[in-house]
Amino acid sequence: MKKDLHPEYKRTMASCACGNTLEVGSTRDEIKVEICSKCHPFFTGKQKLVDTAGRIDRFKKKYAGFDAAAAAKKK
């Protein structure tokens, strides 16, 4: 068998944007996540809008003209 074939698997801390930290096993030194089980709407029972960097606004802006263009095309 070859030696040093697999990466080192160690205990590391995963930190959430809400401030929660979890100890997990990984090959990385540090893990940062945007949402975890303490702040995710499915687990908390509260509905919350999660908009990362204005994705909803960009989507609405990108596709805003399609309804008008489709209506004009039908006429």
UniProtKB/Swiss-Prot annotation:
GO terms for cellular component: ribonucleoprotein complex; ribosome. Keywords: Metal-binding, Ribonucleoprotein, Ribosomal protein, RNA-binding, rRNA-binding, Zinc. GO terms for biological process: translation. InterPro entries: Ribosomal_bL28/bL31-like_sf, Ribosomal_bL31, Ribosomal_bL31_A, Ribosomal_bL31_sf. Gene3D superfamilies: Ribosomal protein L31. It comes from the Bacteria. Pfam families: Ribosomal_L31 (PF01197). Zn(2+) binds at C16, C18, C36, C39. Its cofactor is Zn(2+). Binds 1 zinc ion per subunit. Coiled coil: none annotated. One of its GO terms (molecular function) is structural constituent of ribosome. NCBIfam families: L31 (TIGR00105), PRK00019.1 (NF000612), PRK00528.1 (NF001809). Binds the 23S rRNA. Part of the 50S ribosomal subunit. Belongs to the bacterial ribosomal protein bL31 family. Type A subfamily. PANTHER family: 50S RIBOSOMAL PROTEIN L31, CHLOROPLASTIC, LARGE RIBOSOMAL SUBUNIT PROTEIN BL31C. This is Large ribosomal subunit protein bL31. The gene is rpmE.
